[in-house]
């Protein structure tokens, strides 16, 4: 689980359009999530469960020797949910960090494995900061829409804590598990890897049915990077998913992967899709990626094919791929090295603002298409400037499904 490996594997950094600054970042920079919480307190429950339909090879400690072959697939499941107000103490980011130690070992902490070292390196200096969630809080009465979050390549379920807590505070049950390969902790950038995470999404939806606070008639999937590919696969196969959100999903950069899967047909999908993309690459960068057989093959573009469902494309002009994750932006490492990734003429602070707007647009999209909220619909139809977004941060396009009337003032139901 190495960030540089993830970047290289997915072609997610275009060298020619990024600023490789001589400086070492800003000593005053601090990532702050500024969106206001909703009406609910956030609860968090951690469920250790297995998918007995699939086998998994466990790894043990620093030796990385197999501790068990043919074991059922472990899925450490994080559930953020609306909770009633209380005087209970909220978690810290250090409490979240500790979860990685039993991510696949369940009750047998691993201190120095690759996932543990990865999370520790990005949590360093932030462990005392307060989060929003209250561990094991009571569930708020009622039933709420379900959102499954699919992390990026090899990433933990805690990759976007702020986004998940924010949505839970606004009345959603958000569920996540780690990004893992088909038979082991290491994810692979291929169809078996995407299939594995897509199956995890469907497994989590099956688990969500058992929760007393979920409304399974309103379901969305969110995927970041390689998780975006997996979420696309899941949405194409699992008809319980009513809406899809892609945080710079890999299907834009590896269109041949869904094409090779044979049963993924974006041109037939009728659910709404919200796509966030980073600062665009230059033509030279795209040409270089085309020379990589894993990137930009001659296959139909998913967004161009997405004509039967509404498509909202939000271009975040000020950020690079890794800035879609609060785990990265919040870290001391990013504070030191972030300017190496930021697009030219933008600042680290622009990246903070962009992340916050990403969360806001995600919320409004889910409110519009899952809760059918008229105010959210109007928000999505306005220009970014009309919504208060600084003009240099976002470019937006909204294309309604081909079978819908142009004048429709409410999102189409699935």
Where are these regions (language model features)?
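Short substrate-entry loop that stabilizes the transition state in hydrolases
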Residues: 126-185, 253-254, 283-285
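Domain-level recognition of soluble alpha/beta enzyme cores
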Residues: 24-147, 348
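Gly/Ala-rich beta-loop-alpha elbow adjacent to hydrolase catalytic centers
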Residues: 223-227, 231
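The feature captures the conserved acid-bearing segment of alpha/beta-hydrolase catalytic domains
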Residues: 138-141, 242-321
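Active-site machinery of serine-nucleophile hydrolases
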Residues: 83-122, 158-185, 191, 313, ...
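Short beta-strand immediately N-terminal to the catalytic nucleophile in serine-hydrolase-like folds
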Residues: 221-223, 247
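Alpha/beta-hydrolase active-site loop
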Residues: 159, 189-216, 233
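Alpha/beta-hydrolase-fold serine-hydrolase catalytic core, especially in secreted/extracellular enzymes
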Residues: 27-34, 43, 84, 318-322, ...
